[in-house]
Amino acid sequence: KHITTAEGGAITTNSKEMYEKLLLLRAHGMVKTPDMKPWEYEMRELGYNYRITDMQCALGLSQLNKLDSFIARRKEIAKTYDSAFKNTIIKPLYTFDSNSSYHLYVVLVDFTKLNISKEELFIWLREKNIGIQLHYIPINKQPYYKNLGFGDEQTPNMDRYYEECFSLPMYPLLSNEEQDYVIKALFEILNG
């Protein structure tokens, strides 16, 4: 998630079994062995076309050189958010961890202590061009998983998380000024 190949990506594993399974998934479940005729192949499982182009690979490799700086910037952003919202009702989902690469910066907000609902806050921030998001909607609320028989479970912790969470902007090119704008907007609500 921290670097791009435009589309697609890479998986690493030290498991031979997992490696073989991933090869099947990426190429329509097809296998070609040396003992087969030149045109033959076998579809051993349902798979997908998860092969990326050489150009996408080149882009990904060039991004690897920037990965350390991307992660360092994300950590700076996380520290700034942590400091800004310390002693407020906006709580980071995780406390600062120097080992985290901060794909997301998720906060929990006790909306019972605000004069605004989660939906109103979300819309208001979006109207101010602040790209907040909600990560993630619980899977037992999704139609696909409901069709598989999930959804009736009692999940009070997940439900509470979903009621309180949203993600603040977190990406390496987020400027200090843009982050300050996000923080000031949230303090408008907190002081409101």
Residue spans of the language-model regions?
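Glycine-rich phosphate-binding loop of ATP-grasp-fold ATP-dependent ligases
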Residues: 2, 6-11
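Exposed boundary/loop context
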Residues: 1-2, 40
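PLP-dependent aminotransferase class I/II
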Residues: 14-192
